[in-house]
């Protein structure tokens, strides 16, 4: 029997409340700043009571963009969505098919190919990113959705996770499919894919947020303002030198940028947790 200790319960709940406050307070300050005008934001100290300029600030960046030479913010949101969704579908497709081939097909050096994929995790981003930019430039894919998404569609982690899951599937499934005359792709579509739905949900959430939060890659690949993404666009709103940053517009843009990943997490929360739990079994 677990002994009930009131002081321990009080302490744990106090720490939980403090942790939540530490996380939510910066978000609340950002929300308040997004509701104020420029003068109120620069007042010292800035008020913590929400103002009435939220819709005005959102409309300003939605129509006029986040800077003097930028696309409207709705365009940046669209670009970020296209990038995140394309990367997500690409990662899932490439990772599932490569893991399926490594596990279920018998061909020479298949384990070597897997470890060659897996060893890329040991390479820092700084080592990989500039050669990748050089390849994209040589292929004439700068300032394009293809250059923005294709290099990020390969994932060693996703391939590893799917490989580990596929290795837990019983061999009897393969034998039954062979007896029924199913081709490898029929076996993949009718048996392997449905059994992988929980893992797919978890990977979808993780990969979408990964693609949505990309900052360095779009900054290196994109110079066309009409192809800019939200995260890079917000960075462009912060003035350097003698310029003045309109923090109310920056915070309004940040709030809009938070909405899509938050919606994805809330909608797929149960499937995401189930996918993480099932992948550990």
UniProtKB/Swiss-Prot annotation:
Known partners and oligomeric status: The complex is composed of two ATP-binding proteins (UgpC), two transmembrane proteins (UgpA and UgpE) and a solute-binding protein (UgpB).
NCBIfam families attached to this UniProt entry: PRK10973.1
InterPro entries per the UniProt record, alphabetical: MetI-like, MetI-like_sf
Membrane association type: Multi-pass membrane protein
Similarity field: Belongs to the binding-protein-dependent transport system permease family. UgpAE subfamily.
Primary subcellular site in the record, as a coarse category: membrane
Subcellular location: Cell inner membrane
Keywords: Cell inner membrane, Cell membrane, Membrane, Transmembrane, Transmembrane helix, Transport
Superkingdom of this protein's organism: Bacteria
Function of the molecule: Part of the ABC transporter complex UgpBAEC involved in sn-glycerol-3-phosphate (G3P) import. Probably responsible for the translocation of the substrate across the membrane.
Any one GO cellular component localisation term in the record: plasma membrane
Species this protein is from: Shigella flexneri serotype 5b (strain 8401)
GO biological process: transmembrane transport
Residue ranges of domain ABC transmembrane type-1 in the record: 77-268
Protein name listed in UniProt: sn-glycerol-3-phosphate transport system permease protein UgpE
Membrane-crossing segments per the record: 16-36, 85-105, 113-133, 142-162, 202-222, 247-267
Range of residues in the leader sequence: none
One Pfam family this sequence matches: BPD_transp_1
């Amino acid at each position: 029997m677990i002994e009930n200790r009131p002081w321990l319960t009080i302490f744990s709940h106090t720490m939980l409340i403090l942790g939540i406050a530490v996380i939510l307070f910066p978000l609340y300050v950002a929300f308040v700043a997004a509701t104020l005008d420029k003068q109120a934001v620069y007042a010292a100290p800035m008020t913590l009571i929400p103002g009435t300029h939220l819709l005005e600030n959102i409309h300003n960046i939605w129509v006029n963009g986040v800077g003097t030479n930028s696309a409207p913010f709705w365009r940046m949101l669209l670009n970020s969505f296209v990038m995140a969704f394309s990367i997500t579908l690409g990662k899932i497709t490439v990772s599932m098919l490569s893991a399926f081939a490594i596990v279920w097909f018998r061909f020479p050096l298949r384990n070597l190919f897997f470890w060659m994929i897996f060893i890329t995790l040991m390479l820092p981003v700084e080592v990989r990113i500039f050669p990748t930019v050089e390849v994209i430039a040589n292929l004439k894919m700068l300032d394009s959705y293809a250059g923005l998404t294709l290099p990020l569609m390969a994932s060693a982690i996703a391939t590893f996770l799917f490989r580990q899951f596929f290795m837990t599937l019983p061999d009897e499934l393969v034998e039954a499919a062979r007896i029924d005359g199913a081709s490898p792709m029929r076996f993949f579509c009718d048996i392997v894919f449905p059994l992988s739905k929980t893992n797919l949900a978890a990977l979808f959430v993780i990969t979408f947020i990964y693609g949505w939060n990309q900052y360095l890659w779009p900054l290196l690949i994109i110079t066309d303002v009409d192809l800019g993404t939200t995260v890079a666009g917000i960075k462009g709103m912060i003035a350097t030198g003698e310029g003045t940053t309109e923090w109310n517009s920056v915070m309004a843009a940040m709030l809009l940028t938070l909405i899509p990943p938050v919606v994805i997490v809330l909608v797929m929360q149960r499937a995401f947790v189930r996918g993480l739990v099932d992948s550990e079994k």
